[in-house]
Each structure stands twice: as C-alpha cells, then as structure tokens.
Design a protein with these regions (language model features):
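Active-site acidic catalytic loop and adjacent metal/ATP-binding pocket
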Residues: 49-63, 74, 239-296
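Plant-skewed but cross-kingdom recognition/interaction modules and surfaces
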Residues: 236-240, 282, 321, 335-346
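Juxta-kinase regulatory segment immediately upstream of eukaryotic protein kinase catalytic domains
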Residues: 2-41
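ATP-dependent phospho-/nucleotidyl transfer catalytic cores
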Residues: 2, 7, 144-263, 272-278, ...
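Generic recognition of stable, solvent-exposed alpha-helical segments in well-folded globular domains
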Residues: 16, 96, 160, 164-167, ...
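Active-site activation/catalytic loop segments of kinase-like enzymes and analogous catalytic loops
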Residues: 99, 103, 290-334, 359-391
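Conserved ATP-binding subdomain of kinase catalytic cores across diverse folds
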Residues: 42-216, 292, 296-297, 312, ...
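Helix-rich C-terminal or lid/interface subdomains of diverse kinases
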Residues: 330-421
Length: 421
C-alpha cells in the first residue's frame, strides 16, 4: 500500500525526496508532466545479500499522460549507520559506482544507440543519483518489472545455469571491447573516473585482517579435507599478503591496450535471470561498486570460484571458457568489431593461465560469506562505537559444516591443479 509518508523516503536517504521521485518518474516514462501521488518503500535484499549498501524497492504511484500509473524502481543507498559507513568505506564504493553509471554506461548507451543496438546492454538503466559522501543513492530500473528474478546465493550452479551468466558476460564484455576498439579515447576518458576501491596497497591495513581470516578458513578446509596432499602442502605455505599483492600486481601490470570495464564482484546475488518467450534464458548484471579496468578473465574466474561446484568445474570448465569467447565474438561482430583483431582465443586462453588467480584469490574471501545462511550472516547495523576494522564485524571462522568446507577446499584444489597459484 502506498502513502504520502515522507518519513519513508527519508529512511532511504535524507536527500531522497518527493521531487526525486518526480524526476525519476519523468525519466522512466518520458512524460514531463508526470505527477507523483503516493509511494512505498520496502527492503529489496535479504540479510547477507548486500553489505556495502542498503537496497530498497520503491513503488511510485502517479499520473502519467493523465492516467493512473504504478512503477517500481530499485534504490541503492549509502547506509545511514555512520559507524558502518566508516568501517566499510561506503562512500568510496558509491563514488565508484556512480562514476560507472554516469560515465561508462552513459558512453555505452550512446555507442549502442547509434548502432540501433541499445537492447544489448544487460545492465539496469540509471534513473537518478546523488553523491555527496553522506547521503548517496543510485536509482535503477527494477529488473523484476521486466520479468527477472533473483538467484539463490547458497546453491552451487550447474553447467546450463552457468552458460546463462557466461553469455551475459560475453554480451557485456563484448560491448566494452567493441567500444575500446572503435572509440578508445572516449573509453579512456570515461574510465579515468573509476578508482580501485580494494586491491591497492594503501588498503591492506583496512582489508588485510579480514582477508587473512578468509585464507585461514581455506587452509583449515584443505587440512581437513585433503590432509597431507601436495595441494594442501602448497597452499599451507601461501599467505594472505602474497595473494593480495598478486591481485594488486595483476591490476597494475594489466595490458593497457586491451581491457574491459569489469563488473568486479560477480557472485550470485549480482545477477537476475528470466526465461524469454522463445524459451531462451537471459540475465541482467547489477551492483558495479567494484567496477575496474582489467582482463575479462577476472570476472569469469571470480564467478567460477564463488558459484560453481566441483562437478561442474571438472566436466565443463574448458567448455564454458570457449562458449564465452564464441558468444563474445558474435556480439562484437554485431557491433561492427572483429574479436580476432583485439582479443583472439589464443590471447584469451593465455590470460586464463596468467589472470585466473585473481578470481581465485578474491573468491576465497567471498565464498565463505556466500555460504552463510541469513541467520548466520552478520548484522552490520549493530555496529556502533569504536569498531575500526571490518575484521571486527566480519568475524569469519573456519566452518564446521563439512559440505561447505569441502566446497571451499575443492576451489583451492582446482586452482592449484590448473596451475593458477
């Protein structure tokens, strides 16, 4: 039920107002005379599904072209808990995502519109934003209104499920590569507003304690599931600092001439899927707070290690990689580019060998969190006072759940067996 209770809007952000809703409704419908009559705000993400922002679904009732209209949008807002904001550096991540939508996606939209291919952009449309470091929010179209539904982050995905996401990444990365090939200076200009929010040496003191807990959990899993094996012995000598520094190195030494604007955080909760009338499956990608310029392999690796199970990796790993590259080739051809001129299969497979470790290293942080049930997830709004480090909130410990522990150990074993570590 909608109302005219302005406190509902203020619960999103003190700067999220009725005027904001009107501007959003105008952009959404194209009617400059649209009128907002009432609204409602409800939570749009479950506990444990989103840590860096508060996600709400806002219903807007109004008059469009003189007729009653109801629309829903998604609003990502910086948490109102000031301690939480400080601990998690929320403003840095919001600044990065705002730049992604206002600079990078704006360029992609312009590029695709000129080619009559805007429908290829599988990213929610940005309908409004505010960025001041304290009251930030981003308003996005509601993918549910287009038939998309969320994904269970606790389940391990099978081959056919993974193909849907690999195709979605081929589409998104293919657009990025086509823009790079055809409008390189414009892309470089747009991406200069992105700022690495995690894997840079200055953030080790902020991130290192928690990342060490994650690697400790993975080492414990290996010791219990694969004790005394060469893989367990190799991983036992690996430190969190070495893995973190390797990620920093890969970002600093990437091939500056060939890159995509990575999603950066490709675990299950950042996708929604739907079934099209012809029976095909489709996916949309969202939550770009970790967007960065890097090899597309990073997104694929992170997805593989946080979402798939051992059986899927063992049977279909190479198939998925080839499927992705072939799908990207088709998208780029549709946009007037030849993938073989910029990112042939040989270069892609070379980057798999060299760069897959990035998704492996980052995935070891995310996988333990992704396997927590809602009851086990951390309540970030309980943070008050002098808590200064994320490790004081994300008090991750080795799991006693054998299924989850084996899943974590199998990720480590796969990375080592394939020479990524």
């Amino acid at each position: 039920m909608t109302s005219t209770d302005r406190s509902l809007l203020a619960s999103v952000s003190s700067k999220f107002t009725e005027e904001t809703l009107r501007n959003v409704l105008i952009k959404l419908t194209g009617d400059d005379g649209a009128v907002v009559t009432s609204w409602n705000v409800e939570a749009a993400a479950g506990k444990g599904d989103n840590y860096l922002s508060v996600v709400s679904r806002v219903t807007i009732d109004g008059l469009v072209q003189g007729k009653s209209s109801r629309n829903t949008v998604i609003v990502k807002a910086i948490p109102t808990n000031k301690t939480r904001n400080t601990i998690f550096r929320s403003k840095d991540f919001f600044k990065n995502e705002t730049a992604f939508y206002t600079k990078v996606i704006a360029l992609f939209e312009e590029f695709l519109t000129k080619k009559g291919k805007l429908e290829l952009l599988n990213v929610p449309r940005c309908l409004g934003y505010l960025e001041d470091g304290e009251n930030d929010f981003i308003v996005l179209e509601d993918a549910k209104a287009k038939g998309f539904s969320g994904i269970d982050r606790l389940k391990a995905w099978k081959y056919e499920d993974c193909k849907v996401i690999f195709k979605a990444f081929a589409q998104y990365h293919g657009i990025s590569l086509a823009v790079l090939q055809q409008q390189p200076q414009e892309l470089l200009e747009a991406t200069k507003y992105l700022s690495e929010p995690l894997f840079t040496e200055k953030f080790w003191d902020w991130y290192g304690r928690y990342y060490t807990l994650s690697i400790n959990a993975a080492q414990d899993a290996m010791a219990k599931e694969y004790p005394g094996t060469p893989q367990e012995e190799k991983f036992r000598t690996m430190t969190s600092r070495k893995l973190f520094s390797k990620c920093v190195e890969l970002l600093n030494e990437r091939n500056k001439s060939v890159f995509v604007v990575n999603h950066g955080d490709s675990w299950a909760t950042n996708f929604m899927t739907r079934i099209l009338p012809n029976g095909d499956h489709d996916a949309i990608i969202f939550d770009f707070q970790l967007a960065r310029c890097a090899s597309p392999v990073h997104d694929l690796a992170y997805f593989v290690y946080t979402v798939t199970d051992k059986e899927t990796r063992d049977k279909y790993f190479l198939n998925l990689l080839k499927y992705y590259h072939n799908e990207m080739k088709q998208i780029m051809a549709e946009l007037g580019s030849n993938i073989d001129d910029i990112y042939p299969l040989s270069l892609f497979m070379e980057e798999v060998k060299e760069q897959f470790v990035f998704g492996f290293a980052f995935g070891l942080e995310t996988l333990p969190m992704s396997m927590l049930s809602a009851d086990e997830s951390f309540d970030l709004d309980d943070t008050n006072g002098e808590v200064l480090n994320i490790a004081d909130i994300w008090t991750l410990k080795p799991t006693n759940n054998k299924v989850n522990r084996l899943r974590l150990a199998d990720v480590v074993k796969h990375g080592i067996d394939h020479g990524f570590l």
